[in-house]
Amino acid sequence: MARPYIGGSNGAIKAVSADTTLQLADQGKTLIGDGSSAGNITITLPATTSSKGYETTIVLGVANNAATEVLITSDTNIVGFIIDSDTGASAYATAGASRGFADAAKAGSKIKLVCDGAKWLILDAASDIAMVTALT
């Protein structure tokens, strides 16, 4: 069953292999990232003030290239727990408008986000290596 969003319903998959700015119509979509080619990718989230209740999941469909990072950016903080699946370590991200998958992150690395109208909350995040907060 499709999930409702502002002005309609959605629940589709969206492929991402280049810089992408998400729209309100992308609410509920699962983004499948393809960072298999060299070169960083930035996924920009919608403005928080117009996105209360907006949810998205971003998953690497293939392993990142050794020279590729996939960064998710917002106009405000992205907060919550992040788990490093390789070491089992977890970290609580308290501030910062960017989170992402590092060079050579493996397929299946994921982050699920929801907006409360003031910030983005991490509902679930796991990667085989530590997540990044900026492109390098």
Residue map of PLM features:
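A conserved acidic, glycine/proline-rich C-terminal tail/linker
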Residues: Y92-A102
